[in-house]
Amino acid sequence: MNDFWQHCSALLERELTPQQYVTWIKPLAPVAFDASANTLSIAAPNRFKLDWVKSQFSGRIADLAREFWNTPIEVQFVLDPKAGMRSAPAGAAPAAPRAPLAPNGPAATVAAIAANLTANASAAPAAPADVPMTPSAAAARHLNADDADIDLPSLPAHEAAAGRRTWRPGPGAAPANGGEADSMYERSKLNPVLTFDNFVTGKANQLARAAAIQVADNPGISYNPLFLYGGVGLGKTHLIHAIGNQLLLDKAGARIRYIHAEQYVSDVVKAYQRKAFDDFKRYYHSLDLLLIDDIQFFSGKSRTQEEFFYAFEALVANKAQVIITSDTYPKEISGIDDRLISRFDSGLTVAIEPPELEMRVAILMRKAQSEGVNLSEDVAFFVAKHLRSNVRELEGALRKILAYSKFHGREISIELTKEALKDLLTVQNRQISVENIQKTVADFYNIKVADMYSKKRPANIARPRQIAMYLAKELTQKSLPEIGELFGGRDHTTVLHAVRKIADERSKDAQLNHELHVLEQTLKG
């Protein structure tokens, strides 16, 4: 029995992502094998994991058991709270050192960095360093569009005028002097709280994080510009602040500026009104790192786009790094000059997707820990299972739970969570259906809905069908057998093959990734 479980675990570890394996398979333990009845009993540490593993992995474990013993085996799951103690919890392992990614040319693609992700994606995200921070509240504040003047933090006049491009290497830590740190963060407009250490990593954002780390390690060399896109609350702003903060640690003299696109538009208007474009250009053209957030706000603003184009050209020519975020794929942003779109496409464009279940659980538990609250795994799984859209929604839900618990003087439980999130869960219960996914995908690829559950196998039908299966697994709570049944009675292994195939290709094929992003946004409304 133990030999089988070692064999089974090793195979599943190769088949699943590290986070999936650690979350679902590692806590399991074989407890009994009845050779006369051909039954294998496997223990799970809590009810949620038992139900999830039973619905998602029992078929695969049974297949492996049949191959191992050369006879059909019935796999039974039992509840045993001690099962989880046989292996370390998911968050217990120390973070592995960050492995450098091999630098690539400026026209790198998503596939170019995918092969280098293993060391970075498999490492558990490090816990935030227990070091007190002293930046002022102003340092963590975004610049407001109604500031009285154009906000161009001062640079040494001789340096700005000469356009000097050399890095001034600094110590490997932020300045010890609190006032100096405050000034540094005030100039850059970086939020010192947003770092790589407290960025929770999962399948949905591992490519973006890997690219961000590469840029932080090699500014102006790899992936310039770096363009991150995705829906609200998925971590785009966190990542670009993390890049800036890492650069300030590595090179304390670096000239860095984070700015929201709306503030940049406001500064262009003020510079135009005051005939101060020379100062405006001198400042932006002399930066070492420019971080522009939500560039879709440039839409329809031709003068702003023109000034940004000149700044972009000057920065890239001087090997300064440009990082841009948007809520959509560059070519999908309306009202943006084609010259800018072509510049965005010349670097690396990476999507950040909504977090998967395991990542949502990790986000909730880490956030609760930062609030000094011990959130049980069962409650975290319950919330993560029902709230799927983005990190902000999860954090907002957690705040409601904490406030409700404090107000009523009750411990946090699933029952209390249901009460606290009653209105939110009512909305979420109007879930995306597999039937809706089939119709949406069929319309998108111009095939009939009936083709989704037919036995036809031409590529123009089989491919959309696999995409629909993948989306059904990602966006609904249906098990693999249930999804297979809704696709014409197909076996769960067929669904599993489709899910793995599309997930693998998505990480390498930018066009497929874009199509899936469009479909997901359509389905989520």
Swiss-Prot record:
Q: Name one GO molecular function term.
A: ATP hydrolysis activity
Question: Which family does the similarity line name?
Answer: Belongs to the DnaA family.
Pfam families found in the cross-reference section:
Bac_DnaA, Bac_DnaA_C, DnaA_N
Query: What organism is listed for this UniProt entry?
Result: Burkholderia cenocepacia (strain ATCC BAA-245 / DSM 16553 / LMG 16656 / NCTC 13227 / J2315 / CF5610) (Burkholderia cepacia (strain J2315))
Question: Region (Domain IV, binds dsDNA): which ranges?
Answer: 406-525
Q: What is known of its domains?
A: Domain I is involved in oligomerization and binding regulators, domain II is flexibile and of varying length in different bacteria, domain III forms the AAA+ region, while domain IV binds dsDNA.
Subunit-structure text: Oligomerizes as a right-handed, spiral filament on DNA at oriC.
What are the start and end residues of every segment in region (Domain III, AAA+ region)? 189-405
| Span list, region Disordered | 160-182
Name of the gene this protein is made from: dnaA
**What are the record keywords, sorted?**
ATP-binding, Cytoplasm, DNA replication, DNA-binding, Lipid-binding, Nucleotide-binding
Q: What is the lineage of its organism?
A: Bacteria, Pseudomonadati, Pseudomonadota, Betaproteobacteria, Burkholderiales
NCBIfam families, per the entry: DnaA (TIGR00362)
Q: Which residues bind ATP?
A: G233, G235, K236, T237
Residues of the region (Domain I, interacts with DnaA modulators) are 1-71
Annotated spans, Domain II = 71-188
What is the protein name for this chain?
Chromosomal replication initiator protein DnaA
Mention one GO biological process in which this protein takes part, according to its record.
Answer: regulation of DNA replication
